[in-house]
């Protein structure tokens, strides 16, 4: 099999490359990214391509499967650029897959696609309108609607959608810091056992999953015969109290309105890059039931949610990074100069 991975150099993309390379059925991998990395991966060659403007068809011709991962989270202050890359760029990918005759497409959706609901497990049939106030959720929901139309127009193509929870690994620590915490995070203090407290925001319950496990899910989807949507998450779900217990920190209750006001103020002041609607997302989305992934993909996580968070925090404290542009070590002065959340990561 020849597989093209679009958005191959980030947190998820690098894990997907590693998982694909372990499979005998995969003979070659083409990794597409805005910036070609100096790092090398088995069976993989890289090419530069921007989903928002470049011709993707030549890269996709002859592929047995395309995995579309490319997505921008920053700059959070430029919603037009985010829409152009995430929604219009995904639409261009789907069109290129059709024109190039690629028989299978695996798309990186998200827990964020789901409509608000109670904090209970839902399967893949839950409504997909996203949290109304979250730009991320609205982009994910719109792309899935466009993918619906792609499937209707191309019933001969095998389409898979993975809807994972929050994805983490140590090598992506500096990337996660730039995306969500910014240049003023006192990284050495977030090591498990050193962090004095974490906020417990009633109603904010999240799921996480290790990037390597997500990479395995994509490899299973790409090389198998499965179709349709699959939730992907690890156990257990985490609130502030459970998170605090996992990392040896005291959980301090912070009401959701106060937490949102603090997030909004610090974002407006450019002290951190995460807009307050991310808290709306954490409060609004339901929890994922990943039974279908286990039964039809043969997938299961190999790491617990607590272990994954501990690994990320240890990586944050150490400044862990990797040799691709999205995962590189941080340029905190450059982040400040760009306005904290003012440029792509």
Language-model-derived ranges and their functions:
Residues 215-274, 290, 310-313, 319, ...:
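Mid/C-terminal beta-alpha module of Rossmann-like enzyme folds, strongest
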Residues 1-22:
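N-terminal Rossmann NAD(P)H-binding glycine-rich loop of SDR-like oxidoreductase domains
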Residues 133-160:
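Active-site Tyr-X1-5-Lys
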Residues 185-237:
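Alpha-helical substrate-binding/gating segment
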Residues 150-206:
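NAD(P)-dependent short-chain dehydrogenase/reductase
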Residues 88, 92-136:
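Conserved Rossmann-fold NAD(P)-dependent oxidoreductase catalytic core, especially the SDR/UDP-sugar
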Residues 81-92, 138-139, 209:
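Glycine-rich NAD(P)-binding loop of the Rossmann-fold in SDR/ketoreductase-type enzymes
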Residues 38, 48-88, 96, 116:
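NAD(P)H-binding glycine-rich loop region in Rossmannoid oxidoreductase-like domains
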């Amino acid at each position: 099999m020849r597989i093209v991975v679009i958005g191959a150099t980030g947190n998820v993309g690098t894990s997907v490359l590693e998982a694909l390379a372990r499979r005998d059925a995969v003979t070659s991998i083409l990794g597409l990214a805005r910036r070609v990395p100096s790092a090398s991966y088995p069976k993989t060659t890289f090419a530069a391509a921007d989903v928002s403007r470049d011709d993707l068809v030549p890269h996709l011709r002859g592929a047995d499967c395309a995995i579309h991962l490319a997505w921008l989270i920053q700059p959070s202050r430029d919603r037009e650029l985010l829409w152009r890359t995430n929604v219009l760029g995904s639409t261009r990918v789907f069109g290129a897959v059709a024109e190039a005759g690629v028989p299978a497409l695996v798309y990186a959706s998200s827990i964020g696609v789901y409509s608000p609901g109670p904090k209970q497990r839902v399967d893949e049939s839950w409504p997909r309108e996203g949290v109304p106030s979250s730009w991320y959720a609205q982009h994910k929901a719109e792309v899935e609607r466009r993918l619906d139309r792609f499937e209707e127009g191309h019933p001969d193509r095998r389409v898979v959608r993975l809807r994972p929870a929050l994805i983490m690994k140590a090598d992506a620590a500096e990337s996660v810091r730039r995306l969500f915490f910014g240049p003023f995070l006192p990284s050495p203090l977030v090591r498990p056992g050193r962090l004095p407290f974490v906020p417990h925001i009633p109603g904010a319950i999240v799921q996480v999953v290790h990037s390597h496990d997500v990479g395995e899910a994509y490899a299973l989807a790409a090389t198998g015969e499965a179709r349709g949507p699959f939730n992907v998450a690890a156990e257990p779900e985490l609130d502030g109290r459970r998170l605090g217990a996992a990392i040896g920190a005291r959980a301090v209750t912070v009401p959701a309105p106060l937490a949102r006001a603090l997030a909004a103020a610090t974002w407006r002041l450019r002290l951190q890059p995460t807009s307050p609607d991310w808290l709306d997302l954490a409060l609004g989305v339901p929890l994922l039931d990943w039974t279908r992934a286990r039964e039809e993909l043969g997938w299961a996580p190999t790491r617990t949610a607590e272990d994954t968070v501990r690994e990320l925090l240890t990586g944050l404290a150490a400044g862990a990074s990797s040799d691709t542009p999205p995962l590189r070590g941080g340029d905190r002065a450059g982040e400040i100069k760009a306005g904290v959340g003012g440029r792509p990561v």
